[in-house]
Swiss-Prot record:
Residues 143-359 are annotated as: Domain III, AAA+ region. This is Chromosomal replication initiator protein DnaA. GO terms for molecular function: ATP binding; ATP hydrolysis activity; DNA replication origin binding; lipid binding. Residues 94-142 are annotated as: Domain II. Plays an essential role in the initiation and regulation of chromosomal replication. ATP-DnaA binds to the origin of replication (oriC) to initiate formation of the DNA replication initiation complex once per cell cycle. Binds the DnaA box (a 9 base pair repeat at the origin) and separates the double-stranded (ds)DNA. Forms a right-handed helical filament on oriC DNA; dsDNA binds to the exterior of the filament while single-stranded (ss)DNA is stabiized in the filament's interior. Keywords: ATP-binding, Cytoplasm, DNA replication, DNA-binding, Lipid-binding, Nucleotide-binding. NCBIfam families: DnaA. ATP binds at residues 188, 190-192. Gene3D superfamilies: 1.10.1750.10, 1.10.8.60, 3.30.300.180, P-loop containing nucleotide triphosphate hydrolases (3.40.50.300). Its main location: cytoplasm. Oligomerizes as a right-handed, spiral filament on DNA at oriC.
Length: 479
């Protein structure tokens, strides 16, 4: 658990229900954050996923937000965490990070997808299948995002091959040479979008049952099944679908039992002529840490890479999204965004949504001036974006240790101290949350990261030469 003093404490708060005059400053900020989120994502999405968030305590510079189940927490984390972090930091300078946690017994807003599983762990929906016809939906319901269709996917040079493969699988699942379909590429480039598009297309025809889940949820669900002694049921459910899609497979690295289970499921499905679709951040051959036999099988079908976006593709995506929003965004602004935000489509989309939401709220058109003003913090962060990988590399070079020791289990001080410094710098220089940082350091827990941050702060106070080292690294990284 976190240390430190509790500065502000707040409880459940509905943006529409509380009068600002009767709330604490933190609650008032929360109302504004929620309103912004609502206007960015729309009423339906807000009600489905975000309304359940409950304001928790602010301890030192870390704010906790609660969700009633692990399923919801994971979903909100994967889809909205970055946005929540940015909105909070814009709202309150004293908040440096936002942590999403599960808290049982919160007032849960009724919603089909958010009930607890049979073991009360909130994991019952982490395996989700969507049968073709609504009446034949099993007790497992899927969050296939209706916005992620082939129609809304913009095709350009970097993604045309992956798009064509996805289309082909949606038209003719289990075709020879296309099973499994392995989609890979960097963060936020459209892998999940394509998987959902395949799922939506297939279920539309009415004859195919599709199961989609992240590898992380596959693992949680598998562990929950072991705990509740229902692994047979879990296996049967999985093996009864026509199409199984697993997103972000890299999460299974280092999870040997779960990999084993996935391998058997994979074989059973492919042998029965069912389709498997997998996404990951690297190609099968580069996914070191996955069992060889699984890697080999994953590479046996069609492997399609989604490359980083080009300027032309970014412009086409922005044009399409601006058009769909119904708000006029001048082409100068679109070009400006496409030049400035080159990392991934998720960020590009987030920036555009923010501009449009701002224009709607203040009732003024989008201009280059308002763009620079509204996106000030985002663009600034872009100018000096530092990645955790860069931090790990620089710190390892500085102390002359192996890069792999950043994620290894070695505890020798010569390795552990630089690792702690890298965690500290990751917290200071990136917007990543503690659990995200932990994951990048060999799947360590967020409390380990918290401890590292505190320890390095303490040491910097006590030892000036250590403090100089850390400051030097920080300056080099900030460029
Ligand atoms: N070519 C595209 N056309 C339209 N929208 C896109 C395109 N590529 C990505 N997007 C949008 O960008 C956002 C991020 O995409 P998505 O979640 O599919 O990325 P991802 O590759 O799965 O990322 P991650 O590695 O984080 O899982 C989504 O809102 C998606 O709709």
């Amino acid at each position: 658990m976190k240390g430190g003093t509790m500065v502000e404490n707040a409880q459940y708060l509905d943006a529409s229900a509380s009068a600002p005059g009767s709330t604490t400053p933190l609650e008032t900020a929360w109302i504004r954050v929620r309103e912004k989120l609502k206007s960015e994502v729309g009423e339906v999405e807000y009600r489905t996923w975000l309304r359940q968030i409950v304001l928790g305590p602010l301890e030192e510079d870390e704010l906790t937000l609660y969700l009633p189940t692990r399923f919801l927490r994971d979903w909100v984390r994967s889809q909205y965490e970055e946005r929540l972090q940015t909105l909070w930091r814009t709202e309150r300078e004293d908040i440096k990070g936002v942590e999403l946690q599960v808290k049982r017994g919160l007032p849960e807003v009724s919603m089909g997808d958010a009930e607890d599983g049979e073991d009360g762990s909130g994991e019952g929906h982490e395996l989700a299948t969507q049968a073709a016809a609504p009446e034949s939906r099993s007790d497992l319901a899927v969050p296939l995002d209706p916005r992620f269709t082939f129609d809304t996917f913009i095709v350009g040079k970097p993604n045309e091959f992956a798009y064509a493969c996805a289309r082909r699988v949606a038209e003719k699942p289990s075709s020879p040479g296309f099973n499994p379909l392995f989609l890979y590429g960097g963060v936020g480039l459209g892998k999940t979008h394509l998987m959902h598009a395949i799922g939506t297309e297939l279920t539309r025809t009415g004859k195919v049952s599709v199961a989609y889940m992240s590898a992380e949820k596959f693992m949680y669900r598998f562990i929950a099944a072991i705990r509740s002694q229902s692994t047979m049921e879990f296996k049967e459910q999985l093996r009864s679908v026509d199409v199984l899609m697993i997103d972000d497979l890299q999460f299974l690295i280092g999870k040997d039992n779960t990999q084993e289970e996935f391998f058997h499921t994979f074989n059973a499905l492919v042998d029965a002529g069912r389709q498997i679709i997998v996404s990951a951040d690297k190609s099968p051959s580069d996914l070191s840490g996955l069992e060889d036999r699984l890697r080999t099988r994953l590479g046996c079908g069609m492997v399609a890479d989604i490359h980083a976006t080009t300027f032309e593709l970014r412009i086409s995506i922005l044009e399409a999204k601006a058009k769909a929003s119904g708000t006029h965004v001048p082409s100068k602004v679109l070009e400006y965004l496409a030049h400035k935000i080159t990392t991934n489509v998720r960020e590009l989309e987030g920036a555009l949504n923010r501009l449009i939401a701002h224009a709607d709220l203040v009732g003024r058109p989008v201009t280059l001036d308002t763009t620079q003003d509204v996106l000030k913090d985002m663009l600034k962060a872009h100018d000096r974006r530092v990645t955790i990988e860069e931090i790990q590399r620089k710190v390892s070079e500085h102390w002359n240790i192996r890069l792999t020791d950043m994620s290894s289990a070695r505890r020798a001080r010569a390795v552990a101290r630089p690792r702690q410094v890298a965690m500290y710098l990751a917290k200071q220089l990136t917007s990543r949350s503690l659990p995200e940082i932990g994951r990048k350091f060999g799947n360590r827990d967020h409390t380990t990261v918290m401890h590292a941050v505190n320890r390095v702060t303490e040491l910097m106070d006590q030892d000036t030469s250590f403090a100089e080292d850390v400051e030097l690294l920080r300056r080099m990284l900030e460029g």
